[in-house]
Amino acid sequence: MSSKKTDALLNWLITLTAIFGCSLTVIFFALSNIKELSIQEKIQFRNQALTTTAIVFLASTAMFNTYYAARRAQAMHKSAIASEKNLEIGLQNAKLNQDRLIAERFMGAIAQLGHEKVETRTGAIYALERVAQDFPQEHWTIMEILTAFVRENASIQHLKGEQQKPEYQGAIYSSRRRGGSRPTPQLEQNLHEEFPKIRTDIQAALTVIGRRNLLEDPKDQKLDLRNTDIRQADLLKTNLQQADLRGADLSGADLRGADLSGCDLSGAKLIRSILYETKLIKASLYGANLCWANLNRTNLSGANLRSANLSGASLRAANLQGANLYKANLQQATLKAANLSGAKLFLANLQGAKLGKANLQQTGLIGANLCGANLNGANLSGANLNAAKLHQTEVYFANLSEASLTEADLYQANLIGANLYRATFYQANLTQANLMGANFSQANLNDVKLEGTILTGAKNLELHQIREALGDRTTRLPDYIEAPTHWRQSS
């Protein structure tokens, strides 16, 4: 029914109500004028007429108010529906405008990434960063674009020549160890080789990637920076958690305070890189080259450094707790006050390494090469040094309590004042070693070679321990122990 018809019907109802009310009033007033009626009856009829009229008009008023209230409610409902539709249309238009704006800014920035001028490319990178910040739904897409830009424009250049191989670089330090020859001029040149400066646009892309909002990163997605040449990159305090950097060259890069936890750096090069206080928790550095890198106070707990080259690297006060360093090269590395508790250093090369006051508690060093290393004041309690090589190693006042040195070679090692409580030296070689003032309480010296060994001033050394060992007349025993007869008779 149209609004005009509804209004006409309402007008008819109003008119009929008014006529009905007036008719009742007229009737009651007419009845009140009958001459046969008493004055009291006339007054009664008139009062009844007025009351009836009032009731009719009050009822009419209530009906009209109810009607108009319903009409107002209906109108407001229609208005709300219309407003909701307008709002929905407005939101759709806003989304369309936003999508158009994103597309324009997005495509404009991407188009400029291929510009010939580095300034334009750099500006495009920062424009993409702003898009990622303003429109979080595009965050990961932009990160993928930037990583692809780095991979495309800074791909690794495979260096030619044997001198570039990690094992060859490590050999430089090998030649410097005791008795080694001086490196050739060519090797010295490689040692001090200057790395090329990173391109401005590549640095900008890495900066944007490194300071992105991690909360917007999707789960199970990784930044792909494989096989990239980002030498001398400034990655100070950047966040590259879980990034894929396999085969990347970060030589000379500044990674101080960066977070590389969970990163895959297998086969990566970090020659002379600065990783001071860097987080590499549970990172994979399998076969990585970290020659001469600064890893002081770096957190490498649980990291995989299997076959990694750390020759000459500085790891002062570094955390390597539980790390895997199987067959790692740590020649001439500095590990003073480092935490290597529970680490696996099986067959690792630690020739000439400095491990003074390091924590090697419960560390696995089976077959490790520690010749010429410095372990003064180190904690090796419970460590496994079976078949380890410790030629001329300095172990002053070190803690070797309950350590296992079965078949270890300690020829000419210096263990002055060492704590050997309950240590096992079964079939170990201590020939010409210096154990002056060492604590031998409950140590196992069964079949240990003690020819020329210095044991003067040894503490808690008992005769039965000496009888189990293999010494000779050159063995220097404490004053309170007499050499066994067969020792004195040996040539």
Regions found by a protein language model. Name each.
Residues 37-145, 464:
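Membrane-proximal alpha-helical anchors
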Residues 52, 56, 77, 119-121, ...:
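Positions within the helices of HEAT/ARM-like alpha-solenoid repeats
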Residues 131-135, 149, 153, 170, ...:
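Residue-level signature of the C-terminal ends
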Residues 1-21:
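Juxtamembrane interface helix immediately N-terminal to a transmembrane segment
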Residues 215-491:
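Tandem repeat scaffolds
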Residues 108-113, 131, 145-156, 188, ...:
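Alpha-solenoid HEAT/Armadillo-like helical repeat scaffolds in large eukaryotic proteins
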Residues 128, 202, 206-209:
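Hydrophobic core/packing positions within alpha-helical solenoid repeats
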